[in-house]
Amino acid sequence: MAPRLPARCWRQLSLVERSATHTTTTAAASSLLLAGRTTPTFSASSPSTVFPSLLPQITKRGVKYGWSTLPKRSRPTRFNQVTQGLPAPTSGPAAALKRREKTTPLRTGVLAVKKGMTVFMGRTGARIPCTVLQLDRVQVVANKTRAKNGYWAVQVGLGERRAENVGAPQLGYYEAKGIPPKQTLAEFKVRNQDGLLPVGVQLFPDWFHVGQVVDVRGITRGMGFAGGMKRHGFAGQEASHGNSLNHRTIGSVGGSQGSGSRVLPGKKMPGRMGAQQHTVQNLPILMVDNELGIVVVKGAVAGHKGAVVKVQDAVKKAPPPEEFVEATKQLLNERFPDAEEKLQAARKLHLELKEARRQGLIDSLIKNGLTEKADGNAAVEASA
């Protein structure tokens, strides 16, 4: 409800009430005031006859503040706090996605196994050091959407695991998707919903092309506890001239007065070295082979032999050509035309098996011909 104004405020008003019951218009009232023939009077007991001519005729129901002319604010959602009549917020999930829009790849990446390093001979005879990465049964396991998860991402799995080594909840997770249990799972954020892929499709090395630059992320080899010379490249102390048992020490760690008689945060000191995530950016792709399932990149990659690394389009370079992106999507649709149908069938079978397990009928179903495969997928096999 609109707030009440005291009577002293009404006396200072110089407007003439305009309503259907009065025949005096504003123009006529103004002429009378100029001629000095009349003086407008207002009744302190009827303020409602003044306000219709001063404020717009809008409803105040649902408006929190008295004389606001803004419409009712929309209720903020979990991932979007933008309201009507207000500028876009500079903080929150929506603003964070907007800031990272230009640095988020358009496509998902893949998981690969580092097989080792070798030499690639260029056309001019130059010996180029390179790393061989193998894609071992890389499949799309799930998609994350903006409405449900707050961002767009693709979950990718590498390799396979025996069902005996996987927990029951994870077995049900894979069973509902019709995918065997994966050795490693990883998530790759994409810019929008165009980067999502059908669940169950397999990504081959031709997901990339020769000459493309990629970013490779991996876990560096653990070096254990290392000193300052190995960990940070310190020069060490004097080799002679009175130095005793301090040849590889780091020396002073700070002053006694200017720094407050303390060791400043971030001081480089001996400690555990390695076993941290490291990204090598802008590595050119030298070779792609679908038969061998390998991608050869120039240079070194973090991790030991057999380590799992993430390979994705470079964020600091131009994305792949639009024609190539569309061609790869079309190729996936041709290779897996019934991916959606298989997913729905797997979900239906998962619900049936889940209900059978809940009722304790899974043993009888197995005797009647239903078997659960070792890879975690459930299937109905016709008994001989």
Swiss-Prot record:
Q: Which domain of life is it from?
A: Eukaryota
Stretches of Polar residues bias are at 240-249
Quote the InterPro entries the UniProt record gives: Ribosomal_uL3 (IPR000597), Ribosomal_uL3_bac/org-type (IPR019927), Transl_B-barrel_sf (IPR009000)
According to the record, the residues making up region (Disordered) are 80-101, 237-262
Please state which protein family the record places this protein in. Belongs to the universal ribosomal protein uL3 family.
Coiled-coil intervals: none
Q: What does this protein do?
A: Component of the mitochondrial ribosome (mitoribosome), a dedicated translation machinery responsible for the synthesis of mitochondrial genome-encoded proteins, including at least some of the essential transmembrane subunits of the mitochondrial respiratory chain. The mitoribosomes are attached to the mitochondrial inner membrane and translation products are cotranslationally integrated into the membrane.
The record ties this protein, via NCBIfam families, to: L3_bact
Q: Which GO terms describe its cellular component?
A: mitochondrial large ribosomal subunit
Single GO term (MF): structural constituent of ribosome
The molecule here is called Large ribosomal subunit protein uL3m
UniProt keywords (A-Z) are:
Mitochondrion, Ribonucleoprotein, Ribosomal protein
Assembly state and interactors?
Component of the mitochondrial large ribosomal subunit (mt-LSU). Mature N.crassa 74S mitochondrial ribosomes consist of a small (37S) and a large (54S) subunit. The 37S small subunit contains a 16S ribosomal RNA (16S mt-rRNA) and 32 different proteins. The 54S large subunit contains a 23S rRNA (23S mt-rRNA) and 42 different proteins.
- Provide the GO biological process annotations: translation
Its gene name is: mrpl9
Subcellular location per UniProt equals: Mitochondrion
